[in-house]
Structure formats: structure tokens, C-alpha cells
């Protein structure tokens, strides 16, 4: 049993010693079986939320009505959820009623995919009622029960299924893929924020190419913001190795570039995904820097971060691997610029006012920009004395 489970065992044992059933469930069990890095450890129990709260000193109520309590144990947090069944779903995304039950199998039956519907006992035995291990061995994404039923319960499960394809390198079972194509319009009921989270994870997976192609084949892409008329662009975009990028800003900049979205249309496209303003601004800045010649002024205006991001995207459009030497050369060229911002100039607006003996006006910022360009391009050294002499010689203003 992995360390993360051993660390969580006291929580399981406290529940069991109090006369309750308790198991590790979900993604942690899947990743353990696959020998992958394990993320959050979740626990399922037949103890009611009130009973869970009484058994542990430190708890947080994050959704008691749905059976979920966070247990704080040592320096970790564990989501402890009561076995439950869910009745009719509202808006294809949330159950109208939750009923607490005593059967682990019935609880696991409501989960989305077989690979996520396994449990583990306190002694490390995996309980697999729906063939999750077999599907992992065969690298197949399959729903628990009829896919149409699962997707009508929560339409986001369609996008989640394709996201797991990308992350795990699996394929969809034929019936799961057919059901996505049939039920795709249900995704319109899901909030943009939830779709954005899944889509970003999909892009970052090692098998994003196959996943994006599945979005195209099932036409699920039509239910994603700004994609409806982008089928051909999406086909070519699927070839891009998004997994080699390291930030959200790079991810969305690469998407803009590969989809052929022009800069004037970029804000509308990115806002449709309800991205934070900072991400939108930086992604557009990277896309704007992309494709420009690497002269001194371009590098200066771009800044180190956007410059390297644009260079990475440019390289990855030609090759799946980054050329670290070229990136270091670009970084070196940037580091050797005489100044990195207007603040680095050895002369200020106040100095210009004194030198010119003129009242303040637009001319001050214009003259600073003129000096800035001369310094960046190497025509002028960044020393106050030289700048003042140069200004007198040039007779600017």
C-alpha cells in the first residue's frame, strides 16, 4: 500500500472501529492500480455526515446535504462522503435529491466511469464491481452502466471521458463514443467554468491529439465556446503538443495561434471561456509576440516571459521537442538588452523638464520614447551625460 494511503489509514480505522464501513475510493484507487502518481485520497463510508463530524475533532462542512465532510488529519485533508444514491437530475448536472444508503456497490454504481468506480479496503484489497481493472488493462474508457443514463445525469461526463482519454492514453469504448455523439447537445446545460477546467486538462494530456480528434468525430466540440465553425482549424490544431507548455497563458496563446484566431477576435474568444482577465491579457500578448522578428525592440516590448513563451510555441509548431539551446540563446539576447523597461533609463521626465526649460506636456513622454528606442537599439548608451549631449546634438523639440 502506497504512503498516501498509509497516511490516511487512521481516518479509515476510526470510522471502522466506530462500527462503520469505510473505503478508499475513486481516482486514488485507479492511479494506485495504474502505478501512477496519486493525487487526493477520497474516502466513502456508510456513516452519516453528522456521525463523521462527531468522530473527528477537525472537520469542514463542504456539502453535508450531499454527504460530504472534509476531515483534517495531521497536515492532510480528506473528503469523506456518505454512501448515497441520486434521484432525478436537474438541468443534466445536479441531482434533485440525495439518499444516504449502506451499500458500497450501490454508491459506486452512480459514478461516471468504471476506472473511477473502484474501492480499496483498509488492508489494500481492491473491490471492483464494474470491471474497472479490466478496462484499465485494455486501456478503455467505459461508463458504469448505460452511457446515455450517465450522460443525462451529468452532461459534463462526456467531456470528462474524452479528458481521461487524453490523460491516460486510452480509447473510448464504442458504445461510450456513440452515446457522446448522440447526447452531445446536453453539454450546453453545463456551466462554461466546468467545461473550461476539463478542456484545459484535456489539452495538457499526453494523448491530446487523439482526444481532440474524438471531439471532432463525435462533434462534441460544437458545444464548446467559440468552436462551432472551427472544425478544420481544430483538425490541424490537434497535431500540436500542448503538453509541452507549462502555463495557462501559454496554453491559450497556443490555441489562439493554432486555431488561426486573429488578435482583434481573441478577447471575445477567450472571454467566452470565462478566463481570468490576467490570463486573457497575457495569452494575447504572447500571441502578438509570436511570429515577430527577434530584433531588440521586439524583445524589449515583449518582455522575457512572453518572449520565451512565444518562442516555445513557435518551436513546437515545427517539432514535438523544444530546442533548449535556442531558448537559452533568446534568453541571453534578452538579458543583454541595455534596458528592460523605461524605468531603467538613466534620465527621467523631470530631467527633461529641467534640460528643456519647458512646461510639462505630451512632448515629455514622446521624447522619453525616442530616447528609449535609441538606447534599446544600441544607437545611444544609457548614461545621463551621453543622453543629454545626444539630445542637444539632435536638437529634438
From Swiss-Prot:
Superkingdom assignment: Bacteria
Entry binding sites for Mg(2+): 40, 42
UniProt keyword terms in alphabetical order: ATP-binding, Magnesium, Metal-binding, Nucleotide-binding, Nucleotidyltransferase, RNA repair, RNA-binding, Transferase, tRNA processing
InterPro entries named in the record: Bact_CCA-adding_enz_type3_sf, CCA-adding_enz_C, CCA-adding_enz_firmicutes, NT_sf, PolA_pol_head_dom, PolyA_RNA-bd
Enzyme nomenclature, EC number: 2.7.7.72
A Pfam family per the record: tRNA_NucTran2_2
A GO molecular-function annotation: tRNA binding
GO biological process terms, semicolon-separated: RNA repair; tRNA 3'-terminal CCA addition; tRNA processing
Residues annotated as binding CTP: 27, 30, 111, 154, 157, 160, 163
Residues spanning the signal sequence: none
Coiled coil location: none
Protein residues bound to ATP: 27, 30, 111, 154, 157, 160, 163
Cofactor: Mg(2+)
Catalytic activity: a tRNA precursor + 2 CTP + ATP = a tRNA with a 3' CCA end + 3 diphosphate; a tRNA with a 3' CCA end + 2 CTP + ATP = a tRNA with a 3' CCACCA end + 3 diphosphate
Broad enzyme group: transferase
Subunit organization: Homodimer.
PANTHER family named in the record: CCA TRNA NUCLEOTIDYLTRANSFERASE 1, MITOCHONDRIAL
Family: Belongs to the tRNA nucleotidyltransferase/poly(A) polymerase family. Bacterial CCA-adding enzyme type 3 subfamily.
Described function: Catalyzes the addition and repair of the essential 3'-terminal CCA sequence in tRNAs without using a nucleic acid template. Adds these three nucleotides in the order of C, C, and A to the tRNA nucleotide-73, using CTP and ATP as substrates and producing inorganic pyrophosphate. Has no poly(A) polymerase activity.
Any further remark recorded for this protein: A single active site specifically recognizes both ATP and CTP and is responsible for their addition.
Name the UniProt record assigns to this protein: CCA-adding enzyme
Natural source organism: Bacillus subtilis (strain 168)
Lineage of the organism: Bacteria, Bacillati, Bacillota, Bacilli, Bacillales
Amino acid at each position: 500500500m502506497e504512503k498516501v494511503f498509509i497516511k490516511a489509514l487512521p481516518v479509515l480505522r476510526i470510522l471502522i472501529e466506530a462500527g462503520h464501513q469505510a473505503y478508499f475510493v475513486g481516482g486514488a484507487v485507479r492511479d494506485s492500480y495504474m502505478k501512477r502518481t496519486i493525487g487526493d485520497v477520497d474516502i466513502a463510508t456508510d456513516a452519516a455526515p453528522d456521525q463523521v463530524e462527531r468522530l473527528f475533532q477537525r472537520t469542514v462542512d463542504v456539502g453535508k446535504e450531499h454527504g460530504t465532510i472534509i476531515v483534517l488529519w495531521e497536515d492532510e485533508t480528506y473528503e469523506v462522503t456518505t454512501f448515497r444514491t441520486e434521484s432525478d437530475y436537474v438541468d443534466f448536472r445536479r441531482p434533485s435529491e440525495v439518499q444516504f444508503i449502506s451499500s458500497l456497490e450501490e454508491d459506486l454504481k452512480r459514478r461516471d466511469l468504471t476506472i473511477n468506480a473502484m474501492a480499496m479496503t483498509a488492508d489494500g484489497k481492491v473491490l471492483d464491481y464494474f470491471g474497472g481493472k479490466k478496462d484499465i488493462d485494455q486501456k478503455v474508457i467505459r461508463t458504469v452502466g448505460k452511457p446515455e443514463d450517465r450522460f443525462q445525469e451529468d452532461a459534463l461526463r462526456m467531456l470528462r471521458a474524452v479528458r481521461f482519454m487524453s490523460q491516460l492514453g486510452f480509447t473510448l469504448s464504442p458504445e461510450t463514443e456513440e452515446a457522446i455523439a448522440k447526447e452531445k447537445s446536453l453539454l450546453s446545460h453545463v456551466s462554461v467554468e466546468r467545461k473550461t477546467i476539463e478542456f484545459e486538462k484535456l489539452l495538457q494530456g499526453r494523448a491530446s491529439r487523439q482526444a481532440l480528434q474524438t471531439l471532432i468525430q463525435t462533434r462534441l466540440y460544437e458545444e464548446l465556446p467559440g468552436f462551432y465553425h472551427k472544425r478544420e482549424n481544430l483538425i490541424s490544431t490537434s497535431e500540436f503538443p500542448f503538453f509541452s507548455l507549462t502555463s495557462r497563458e501559454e496554453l491559450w496563446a497556443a490555441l489562439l495561434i493554432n486555431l488561426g484566431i486573429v488578435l482583434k477576435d481573441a478577447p471575445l474568444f477567450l472571454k467566452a471561456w470565462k478566463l481570468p482577465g490576467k490570463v486573457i491579457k497575457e495569452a494575447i500578448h504572447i500571441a502578438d509576440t509570436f511570429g515577430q522578428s527577434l530584433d531588440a525592440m521586439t524583445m524589449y516590448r515583449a518582455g522575457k516571459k512572453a518572449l520565451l513563451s512565444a518562442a516555445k510555441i513557435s518551436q513546437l509548431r515545427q517539432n514535438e521537442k523544444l530546442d533548449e539551446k535556442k531558448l537559452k540563446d533568446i534568453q541571453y539576447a534578452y538579458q543583454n538588452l541595455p534596458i528592460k523597461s523605461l524605468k531603467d533609463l538613466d534620465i527621467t521626465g523631470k530631467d527633461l523638464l529641467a534640460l528643456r526649460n519647458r512646461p510639462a506636456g505630451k512632448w515629455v513622454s514622446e521624447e522619453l520614447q525616442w530616447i528609449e528606442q535609441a538606447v534599446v537599439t544600441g544607437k545611444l548608451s544609457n548614461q545621463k551625460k551621453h543622453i543629454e549631449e545626444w539630445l542637444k546634438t539632435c536638437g529634438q523639440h
